[in-house]
Curated annotation (Swiss-Prot):
Organism of this sequence: Anaplasma marginale (strain St. Maries)
Name of protein: Cytochrome c-type biogenesis protein CcmE
Record SUPFAM superfamilies: Heme chaperone CcmE (SSF82093)
Taxonomic superkingdom: Bacteria
Underlying gene: ccmE
HAMAP family named in the record: CcmE
Binding sites annotated in the UniProt record for heme: H121, Y125
Topological category with respect to the lipid bilayer: Single-pass type II membrane protein
Segments passing through the bilayer: 8-28
Amino acid sequence: MKRKHKRLLFVLASFCAAGCALLFILSELRESVSFFYTTSELLSGPQRESNLPVRVGGMVVKGSIARSTDSISFDLTDFKTELNVVYSGMLPPLFGEGVGAVVKGRLLHGKFVADEVLAKHDEKYMPKKYTAPKSSPEPK
């Protein structure tokens, strides 16, 4: 085989290997992308009939949080449609009425059974242990 043909074969093999690696990386990233549906999209789309886990985001409706001995239920809204969510587990500290939340789970018999609840916050949020006290005396 001539040197020119060996070089061409090496370049083609390199491109094939790089393409396979890129395809593998993109397929793995696609599964870990963290998007969510709105309540309207979930209830009107094909995800409604699916038994696969999905993420749904919205605002927790004020006055909708109801705690029982083993679970908590609340309504999520995108200000068009409300979705009843049932969750058993520890809620995040920022969770509350009127707060944005993303839930991951399945829609079963008109209720969304959540496996995970995430509370959303704005870009200015700082944990209390990292914020400075408001009434600190100024140095003289």
